Amino acid sequence: MVESSNTKKVKVSSLCELCHGRKAVMKRPKNLRKLCKECFFHVFETEVHNTIVENKLFANVENSEFPERRAVAIGASGGKDSTVLASVMKTLNERYNYGLKLVLLCIDEGIKGYRDHSLETVKMNQKEYDMPLEILSYKDLYDWTMDEVVSCAGIRSSCTYCGVLRRQALDKGAEKLGINHIVTGHNADDMAETVLLNLLRGDINRIENSTKIITDSENSVIQRSKPFAYMSQKEIVLYAHYKNLTYFSTECTYSEEAFRGECRSLFHSLSAVLPSVHTNTIYSGQQFKRKAKAMKRQNNKNNKNNKNNMADEHEVLPNGTVAIKESKRCKKCGSLASNDLCQACFLLAGLEVSRAKVSIDSEGDGAAKLSKTLEGLTF
């Protein structure tokens, strides 16, 4: 459903601790300071601006001599994070003269009762913020909807498939618009949950990307950044509430089965005792990253005798092995890939096999369809 934020107001019977003139209406979740609406807006927007400036989020577009290269896409979903992001980016772009052309980029995954409704909110945001809007669908890009993916692969795999497909869809949308930078509404809660997920899975190597403010991929030329990296979800909800922003508040139909939900519940309990638990977790993840880089430098130093014999396309990995850097193209869709198939096409190939197998039981020519499907796939 589409609604304005209805966050319950916190009763605070004192003056704002910043301006000392207006009545405080909240205790800021991050540090429990009592603030009025105006001061909360100011500190929220200033902290986002500081994140942008300190991490040079738009250095690759702000300095461009060509206006068309100053475009930045906002990953829009109609939810609270992307709605607040669009509002704040518009405000900061005008206040600090970033000189950016902001564009809303929305992906329709094909989830009935969820995405079809949230798209209406995105269209409302387009009018309210006066930004161009581009919508791409899984069906048009992949000939699959997420509802079809779930019916074939099962609900427990939904986030795995959707994460890969959505990332590539955003890249394709940005390429279509001639944009090489996307901002997303990922916040401190999201980043902390990802750090914990990677720890629980024993995937230490992924922690580096999960704590980066700016990320890029060896398989894409599109750069991504997270202006809300240090802003909590609670504060984003408060901002939406006091700004009276309209957003789509229903959770994704398939998100309840995600393991991430267990991490979210744990953080929810911990934040009641330690409000800074999310940012603390992010900082801890960044320390892992620094340790990993130090180990890599040491390994490179230990292998200095071999270094002069290596071409520029070689890299010494932390375990001492040598990786060859190659720029490949997916044989199916043409996207940059480290293997013959990009991750999205590899997953889609598996789905096509499953769909063809299912047809064996329902149609007489199912076996022929399966054989034809297998012949068309490259692994």
Curated annotation (Swiss-Prot):
GO terms for molecular function: nucleotidyltransferase activity; tRNA binding; tRNA-uridine 2-sulfurtransferase activity. Keywords: Cytoplasm, RNA-binding, Transferase, tRNA processing, tRNA-binding. GO terms for cellular component: cytosol; cytosolic tRNA wobble base thiouridylase complex; mitochondrion. InterPro entries: CTU1-like_ATP-bd, CTU1_C, Ncs6/Tuc1/Ctu1, Rossmann-like_a/b/a_fold, TilS/TtcA_N, tRNA_thiolation_TtcA_Ctu1. Pathway: tRNA modification; 5-methoxycarbonylmethyl-2-thiouridine-tRNA biosynthesis. Its EC number is 2.7.7.-. One of its GO terms (biological process) is tRNA wobble position uridine thiolation. It is found in: Cytoplasm. It comes from the Eukaryota. It is an enzyme of class 2 (transferase). It holds the Pfam family zn-ribbon_14. Transmembrane segments: none annotated. Plays a central role in 2-thiolation of mcm(5)S(2)U at tRNA wobble positions of tRNA(Lys), tRNA(Glu) and tRNA(Gln). Directly binds tRNAs and probably acts by catalyzing adenylation of tRNAs, an intermediate required for 2-thiolation. It is unclear whether it acts as a sulfurtransferase that transfers sulfur from thiocarboxylated URM1 onto the uridine of tRNAs at wobble position. Prior mcm(5) tRNA modification by the elongator complex is required for 2-thiolation. May also be involved in protein urmylation. Belongs to the TtcA family. CTU1/NCS6/ATPBD3 subfamily. This is Cytoplasmic tRNA 2-thiolation protein 1.
